[in-house]
């Protein structure tokens, strides 16, 4: 068995996180909102949110948000100016959630968020981090499309959570999606440090240390257990 509960035999916590960014290039663009939940297991075996952050981050002096980002997220230059913090403050808040470790970092399309996160953490020492990409899992569970909004609908969570292109809403939604995935099939642990990528485009951005990257196409239906990406990797 490799279900959600078993992950807490290996990790002190899951840190579910999401970013909103000023663009798509981690080298040129910045995180403008960073949200995260630290999820721990109680002695009774229940999951609880042990810590939470939702932080806006100021842009470098003289920079402004592209209009399409404002439209998509609702985050404005004025909001970042009045409510945003310096990047170092955001990092300090984030590091409080990843310690004590070890922790498992969880995100939907984790490759994107992890690349931006590493840029934010440059010069800091977060320690060793493992990764779980719910997008890779979801590609084995449902046919295209595979956005978080699609997972919310697939697991009938739309009355419980919202997907608003705001980081804090997305991490709360992903927590519920993760639990629904676990109820559906007990193999989440087999996806740790395994990122699927579209073979048509290759891996986007830098490769995250410790992560195994494997081509993963689109399925027309839920993948049988023996045909999931981890199962195929185990037979190599």
Feature map (PLM): residue ranges:
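Conserved non-catalytic scaffold segment of RNase H-like nuclease domains
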Residues: 2-128, 149-165
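Short alpha-helix plus adjacent loop in nuclease-associated cores
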Residues: 131-150
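Short, glycine/acidic-enriched loop or turn micro-motifs at the edges of active sites
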Residues: 21-23, 136, 173
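A structural signal for well-ordered alpha-helical segments within the folded catalytic domains
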Residues: 146, 172-175
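Active-site catalytic microenvironments for nucleophilic, acid-base chemistry
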Residues: 120-123, 140, 154, 177-184
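Acidic two-metal-ion nuclease catalytic site recognized across multiple nuclease folds
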Residues: 1-9, 175-236
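Acidic donor-binding loop at a coil-to-helix junction in glycosyltransferase catalytic cores
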Residues: 168-169
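Short, structured loop/turn "capping" segments at alpha-beta junctions
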Residues: 127-132, 145, 160, 185-189
